[in-house]
Amino acid sequence: PTQTQLLANYPNPFNPETWIPFQLAQDSTVTAKIYDITGKQIKMIELGHIPAGNYVEVNKAIYWGGRTGDGEQVSSGTYFYQIEAGDYTETRKMVILK
C-alpha cells in the first residue's frame, strides 16, 4: 500500500464480534484501542512490530470479540476504535446491536 490507512470494521453494526481492517505503507509497531461512548479506553490490542501490507481479510485484520480488557461483554451502543502505527493515528466509529 502507498499509505497507512484504517478501514471500516466489518460487520458494522455487529454482535458480538467484528474485524478491523487496515493497511500499512511501512513496517510499524501497531496498537489498536477500543473506547466507549464517553471516551474511556476499554480494550487495547497490541500487535507488535509487523511488516507493511494489507491486513483486510478475516485472518489478518484485527479481531475484537466485544469484550473489555477485563473480559466483560460490552453492552449495545456506539464505540470507537483507534489504530496507532508509527506516527499514524486514526479513529473510527462502530456500533454493537444485541
State where each predicted segment sits.
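Residue-level signal for short segments within beta-strands and strand-turn junctions
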Residues: I34-T38, T68, A85, I96-K98
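Extracellular and select intracellular beta-sandwich modules with Ser/Thr-enriched
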Residues: Y88-R92
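Short beta-strand edge segments in extracellular beta-sheet folds
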Residues: G48-H49, M94-K98
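N-terminal processing/targeting junctions
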Residues: S28, G86-D87
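Short, surface-exposed loop/turn motifs with a glycine/proline- and acidic-biased composition
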Residues: E46-G86
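Glycine-centered coil/turn sites that cap beta-strands in beta-rich domains
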Residues: P1-Y10, F14-T38, M44-G48
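Conserved beta-strand and immediately adjacent loop positions that scaffold enzyme active sites
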Residues: T31, Y63, K93
